[in-house]
Amino acid sequence: MIILPAIDLKEGKCIRLYQGDFKASKVVAEDPIEVALKFKENGAEYIHIVDLDGALTGEIKNLSIISSIIKTINIPVELGGGIRNLNTIDMLIGAGIERIILGTAALNNRGLVEEAVKKYDEKIAIGIDAKNEKVAINGWLNVSSINYIDFAKEMEKIGVRNIIFTDISKDGTLKGPNLKQLEKLNESISCNVIASGGIKDIEDLKVIKEMDVYGAIVGKAIYSGNINLNEAIKIINKGSSK
């Protein structure tokens, strides 16, 4: 199982949200490039970045910092937040982003997902952010009537290979992930599932690994010191190729 440390960008700084609430944001680092380098030094093989300004506005806002991170760390980066059209996807892949996460755009524009997957295959991931099992969009400000499993199955039919699942009520809380929903999703589709939201310690990571989930995104638990990234990667990778 792969562990992806998370960087959430707002106005050029590293921040953490609580349950997706932009009013409950806290700056955890002034220099995201330094944070990314530290993640790499601690053994990260992949970094998860969200442009929170982009998620709200529908346009990538932190591109210069994201580009600097890619050039500096030289390990794969996946990016989500505000990616709403194929031109933006082309530009970001051209800038060196390894995997693009579509969230709101995937729900509002199935045609975009089809085009993007046809062109970039596994470089396209779908971010499914759920609240009470319903898919949320627009920086988590609006909740749709669509069930998260139904949506995941629809994306799989299109050809999507990677799904990032977040239970919003758990995100940034350090109260543990929604294991029940995660397991249900992982059993319902054959895509790679990446767990996100609420992971608080190494025990959570062990449980997620036992479910045969492809990856786990860890944010607040690293910044708060609950998880030592280097140790976690060693423990989770011990005796395992997945």
Curated annotation (Swiss-Prot):
Pathway: Amino-acid biosynthesis; L-histidine biosynthesis; L-histidine from 5-phospho-alpha-D-ribose 1-diphosphate: step 4/9. GO terms for cellular component: cytoplasm. Keywords: Amino-acid biosynthesis, Cytoplasm, Histidine biosynthesis, Isomerase. The active site is at D8 (proton acceptor), D129 (proton donor). The keyword 4Fe-4S does not apply. Its EC number is 5.3.1.16. It catalyses: 1-(5-phospho-beta-D-ribosyl)-5-[(5-phospho-beta-D-ribosylamino)methylideneamino]imidazole-4-carboxamide = 5-[(5-phospho-1-deoxy-D-ribulos-1-ylimino)methylamino]-1-(5-phospho-beta-D-ribosyl)imidazole-4-carboxamide. CDD domains: HisA (cd04732). It is found in: Cytoplasm. Pfam families: His_biosynth (PF00977). It is an enzyme of class 5 (isomerase). The keyword Cytoplasm applies. PANTHER family: 1-(5-PHOSPHORIBOSYL)-5-[(5-PHOSPHORIBOSYLAMINO)METHYLIDENEAMINO] IMIDAZOLE-4-CARBOXAMIDE ISOMERASE. Belongs to the HisA/HisF family. This is 1-(5-phosphoribosyl)-5-[(5-phosphoribosylamino)methylideneamino] imidazole-4-carboxamide isomerase. It comes from Clostridium botulinum (strain Kyoto / Type A2).
